[in-house]
Amino acid sequence: MTVPRVVLVGPMGVGKSTVGALVAERLGCAYRDTDDDIVTAEGRTIADIFVDEGEPVFRAIEKRAVHTALAEHDGVLALGGGAILDADTRALLAGHRVVYLSMEVDEAVKRTGLNAARPLLAVNPRRQWRELMEARRHLYTEVARAVVATDGRGPEEVAQAVLDALELKEA
């Protein structure tokens, strides 16, 4: 069994994909995103899965994708924003180098706006995002070895902060 060098968690729009690719590049390893794994395996977008099947079906698909990626991938891994909702997934993350990328609501609204591709924020994104974070923040913190705030920082700066937080050296 392989183990990811870094696992990134955090809300939608925080920059897990962008930062994850930069961290992987700096470490000289591969990058993987479980949202991409889901889209590839299912042959449709996450938004389509939500609309066609509902959130419970999506969460079951996501759980399988995360468990597979944690077992197979030895680089940098980004998880979907809601992956930490599953207790089994949180238990699997124990012992991994997990970094919670955080951001405040004003930054989140700037980044996610009214994007229709984000089904959980389709109506009143500011309120929805606050509610999601109230439900999830403690779960992100529970699984994380480090927390890196992304507000007002560019992806390069956040990537460096992730490396610094985990005391990892660039390749």
UniProtKB/Swiss-Prot annotation:
It is an enzyme of class 2 (transferase). HAMAP family: Shikimate_kinase (MF_00109). Keywords: Amino-acid biosynthesis, Aromatic amino acid biosynthesis, ATP-binding, Cytoplasm, Kinase, Magnesium, Metal-binding, Nucleotide-binding, Transferase. ATP binds at G13, V14, G15, K16, S17, T18, R118, R153. Its main location: cytoplasm. Its cofactor is Mg(2+). It is found in: Cytoplasm. Substrate binds at D35, R59, G81, R136. One of its GO terms (molecular function) is ATP binding. The lineage of its organism: Bacteria, Bacillati, Actinomycetota, Actinomycetes, Kitasatosporales. One of its GO terms (biological process) is chorismate biosynthetic process. SUPFAM superfamilies: P-loop containing nucleoside triphosphate hydrolases. It catalyses: shikimate + ATP = 3-phosphoshikimate + ADP + H(+). One of its GO terms (cellular component) is cytosol. Binds 1 Mg(2+) ion per subunit. Transmembrane segments: none annotated. Mg(2+) binds at S17. It comes from the Bacteria. Pathway: Metabolic intermediate biosynthesis; chorismate biosynthesis; chorismate from D-erythrose 4-phosphate and phosphoenolpyruvate: step 5/7. The keyword Cytoplasm applies. Catalyzes the specific phosphorylation of the 3-hydroxyl group of shikimic acid using ATP as a cosubstrate. Its EC number is 2.7.1.71. Gene3D superfamilies: P-loop containing nucleotide triphosphate hydrolases. This is Shikimate kinase. Belongs to the shikimate kinase family. Monomer. It comes from Streptomyces avermitilis (strain ATCC 31267 / DSM 46492 / JCM 5070 / NBRC 14893 / NCIMB 12804 / NRRL 8165 / MA-4680). The gene is aroK.
